[in-house]
Amino acid sequence: MTGPELFLMDTNILVYAYDKDETEKSGKAKGILAKCFLGETDLAISNQNLAEFVYATTRKSKLSFDQAIVNITDIFTSTTFKKISYTAKTVISAIEIAGEFKMPFWDSLLAATMRENGIFNIYTENVKDFKMPWIKAVNPLA
């Protein structure tokens, strides 16, 4: 599934799903994940999101490395998540996007990866970071 109906889950939403300190946001994020695991909705996730998730959750001691591996493996092996990644061509596109929209490279890399995979929607807490005309950013935690 691609196009207007598919959403990519940004790293911040994924991190909240495993955050015991942010109970309200965590509950909403867990609900989104659960719907995907149950096959009630489709989500996309990039390898970049998974790497950022490991960094964010283990750096702040929210998860052990073993727990992070289990969580990433659950997502990676699930058939209900569309997994996407970037190439060298995507990196060039991301640099161009970063320059044009004056945005951080890592956000532009995610935007370029989405565009190359036909995904135009993103669930993110950082709606302001995705102002490209081809992306609809939605904060599901609001």
Located regions from the model:
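Alpha-helix capping/helix-boundary segments
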Residues: 13, 49, 90, 109-110, ...
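Helix-adjacent hinge/juxtasegments
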Residues: 55-70, 76-78
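Acidic, PIN/NYN-like endoribonuclease modules and their adjacent C-terminal/linker elements
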Residues: 1-6, 111-142
